[in-house]
């Protein structure tokens, strides 16, 4: 299955890529309504590095998600795959390209849900909707940082966003 979210950010591709290279960016990209916490962060610049996130998937069911960085091509692309987690497979490409208004940020995810046929049947209702909400938040957070005053002043880290 595939999920794609694309947004235009009014900043250079280099600035958008630099946002994703910040040490605690993963924590900033977790929406407040998600029951998830970063156990171990990983630099996107280190191919092979693994980030570990503990997240609730349904109700009280918690899983550990291990994502490994597999591609690093600044300032246009980085990629991670799921090594361990809730999906049968997961490949997430973060693509940043020049745009007339700044940069185009595209998250392209190819995934296989768990539970075979049943998982594929419910994915459009459950997984796709959750991804849409999650990546709307992530792109908005990226936009706010890259287009905001923190860029002009060089301030980092931003510790939260107003929603």
PLM features per residue range, with description:
Residues 2-4, 62-67, 89-92:
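Short, surface-exposed coil-to-beta transition loops
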Residues 38-84, 104, 137-145, 149-150:
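Glycine-rich portal/gate segments that line the openings of hydrophobic small-molecule binding cavities
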Residues 6-10, 37, 54, 68, ...:
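Generic structural detector for well-ordered beta-strands
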Residues 1-42, 46-47, 163:
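Hydrophobic ligand-binding cavity/cleft-lining segments
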Residues 9-11, 57-59, 71, 86, ...:
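Beta-strand elements of well-folded, non-transmembrane domains
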Residues 12, 74-75, 99-102:
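Short strand-connecting beta-turns/loops that link adjacent beta-strands
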Residues 150-163:
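Short, basic, low-complexity termini and linkers enriched in Ser/Thr/Gly/Pro
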Residues 79-133:
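Beta-strand/loop substructures that line and gate deep hydrophobic ligand-binding cavities in soluble
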